Design a protein with these regions (language model features):
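Conserved C-terminal guanine-recognition region of P-loop GTPase G domains, centered on the G4
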Residues: 71-139
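Noncatalytic linker/hinge segments flanking ATPase motor cores
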Residues: 45-46, 90-95, 156-160
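Conserved G1/Walker A P-loop phosphate-binding module
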Residues: 1-82, 132, 163-181
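Conserved nucleotide-binding/hydrolysis micro-motifs of P-loop NTPases
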Residues: 32-33, 56-58, 93-95, 120-125, ...
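Canonical P-loop GTPase G-domain recognition
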Residues: 113-115, 120-171, 177
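Short, conserved beta-strand segments within well-ordered enzyme catalytic domains
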Residues: 16, 26, 50-53, 87-89, ...
């Protein structure tokens, strides 16, 4: 399982749609559009993975004042708990927000393998904005979910963190075939 997490309006759903190669998640330029987890089995490189889009995580009730935020946080926490890899999506144009730091801290504490996808780096000239996020000590990939920039590197980095199931484990998941002759 690979989950996309982050604060509201960083482009998680746009990235989900880009990786799914289909418009599955609703994308709208307003916080709080995604509330429940959206899942889809997708091909990343040579792997089939369950990709999960989560709602934007907000922790401060004084700021959000939305009763659904607790449920959105809960859904995101479940996604992180179930994940092998968490892609933390940040808005590189806005730089590091306190909420980004809090999301990164909490996801790292989960023990999940983490990558930061610095979104909204629409051109090569924007990539410098992604470097600010390197201070968290995680792999940072400059991307543009809207334009498809950086997807190869993000997919490669993600796939490299997914353990390869051994042959015996794969065989045990296959249905048993029986023939009576």
């Amino acid at each position: 399982v690979v989950s996309l997490v982050g604060r509201p309006n960083t482009g998680k759903s746009a990235l989900f749609n880009r990786l799914a190669k289909k418009k599955v998640a609703i994308v709208f330029d307003q916080p709080g559009v995604t509330r429940d987890r959206v899942t889809r089995t997708v091909s990343l490189g040579d792997r089939q993975v369950m990709l999960v889009d989560t709602g934007g995580i907000a922790f401060d009730k004084r700021v959000t004042k939305d009763p659904l935020d607790d449920e959105t946080r809960s859904q995101a926490a479940l996604a992180v708990e179930d994940s092998t890899v968490c892609v933390i999506v940040v808005d590189a144009r806005e730089g590091i927000a306190p909420l980004d730091a809090e999301v990164i801290r909490r996801v790292r504490e989960s023990g999940c393998s983490c990558i930061i996808a610095a979104n909204k780096c629409d051109t090569v000239d924007d990539d410098w904005r992604a470097h600010e996020f390197e201070r968290f000590g995680l792999k940072v990939v400059a991307i543009s979910a809207e334009h498809g920039r950086g997807m190869e590197e993000l997919v490669s980095e993600t796939v490299s963190r997914i353990p390869v199931a051994d042959k015996e484990e794969e065989d045990s998941k296959k249905p048993l075939r029986v023939a009576i002759v």
